[in-house]
Amino acid sequence: MAKFAPVQYKYIIKAEFEIDGIVDREDIIGAIFGQTEGLLGMELDLRELQKQGKLGRIEVEYKRVGNKTIGTITIPTSLKAVETSLIAAAIETVDRVGPAKARFRVKEIVDVRSSKREYIRNRAKELFVQLLSKTAPDIEELRRELEEAYYSKQLIEYGEEKLPAGPLVEKSDEIILVEGRADVVNLVKHGILNVLGMNGINIPKSVVELSKRKKVTLFIDGDRGGELVLRNLLAAGADIDYVAVAPPGREVEELTNKEILKALKSKIPLEQYIKNLRISINNDENKEKYKELLSKVFDTKKAIVFDEQFNIIDEKPLEEIDKLPSAYGIAIDKILDNETYAKIKGKYQLILALDSNVNAQERVITLKDIQ
């Protein structure tokens, strides 16, 4: 917060001075009192005004430059504007400090109340914005919280892992498998009650066992993380019959009823989904570039980063991977695991690795994908 003179003061006189000699603070103050005495009568005598509390302490800041003394003075007053102006003008008449010639010039008279009003105006704006941000509800967020609270009551806990599930997951011959609790809540909200959440990418044993007894449609987000979820499910021995995908860039938990139904209606057999993935990678015009970059790091225990033209920018040993700069992509001589991913998350758009067991936000391409 800005500092102001005591509340009784209305104005602050600010002046500069230049003295042709070496003097001290006491000499300067003495000259101001002495040479203004009697100029404006007893009513505006500086000493009398100080005794009455209408004039504050004269503050002097100065320094010596060669054989001269230069600096500034500030004088707070509680007088009216006219009287303050007279005193300011009187100070400019001081032409000597001791035996040395002096020149005083008033720079400005600060209206303390105006400064306070400006501070109040600006601070009030800040406080008003803070107040609105705290008191004005985010309707969308409130809606989600209320829906979460309401529809969560309809969920059950499934299996020894107590997975979030719709009330018909055990009775139905077909189930919809999703990643997390928020996905389950959203589907239940829209009337899909045979849904089961996995609570992450570590595949629960209950999910694998249930997939052996029921037809399973895996419903994944519209990003590349879904590919890893599927890979982990298959690696864990789960039987997946169909795959449904949310619209590009969308998450299952945020889909509308229409979007959910459309995605589920467009589900495809697992074999076709895997085939489509292979075609997508094979048709990538940069496939050979990916191979080349992975071959450069293969068996080197290093990581390299590259730009959008696949020019190598920097490389470091894997133990120093967190020291590499942000760039378009990174290629690493190892399997992408959670520990490594934590060090590079958010720094690259593309990650090339020998293999991966991470649900990464970025695009991840492995040796299997490009062979």
From Swiss-Prot:
Mg(2+) 1 binds at residues 179, 221. Its cofactor is Mg(2+). InterPro entries: DnaG_primase, Primase_DnaG_arc, TOPRIM_DnaG/twinkle, TOPRIM_dom. Mg(2+) 2 binds at residues 221, 223. PROSITE patterns: TOPRIM. Gene3D superfamilies: 3.40.1360.10. It is an enzyme of class 2 (transferase). Binds two Mg(2+) per subunit. CDD domains: TOPRIM_primases. Keywords: DNA replication, DNA-directed RNA polymerase, Exosome, Magnesium, Metal-binding, Nucleotidyltransferase, Primosome, Transcription, Transferase. It catalyses: ssDNA + n NTP = ssDNA/pppN(pN)n-1 hybrid + (n-1) diphosphate. Its EC number is 2.7.7.101. GO terms for cellular component: cytoplasm; DNA-directed RNA polymerase complex; exosome (RNase complex); primosome complex. One of its GO terms (molecular function) is DNA-directed RNA polymerase activity. Pfam families: Toprim_4 (PF13662). SMART domains: TOPRIM. Residues 173-248 form the Toprim domain. One of its GO terms (biological process) is DNA replication, synthesis of primer. Forms a ternary complex with MCM helicase and DNA. Component of the archaeal exosome complex. HAMAP family: DNA_primase_DnaG_arc. Belongs to the archaeal DnaG primase family. RNA polymerase that catalyzes the synthesis of short RNA molecules used as primers for DNA polymerase during DNA replication. Also part of the exosome, which is a complex involved in RNA degradation. Acts as a poly(A)-binding protein that enhances the interaction between heteromeric, adenine-rich transcripts and the exosome. This is DNA primase DnaG. The lineage of its organism: Archaea, Nanobdellota, Candidatus Nanoarchaeia, Nanoarchaeales, Nanoarchaeaceae.
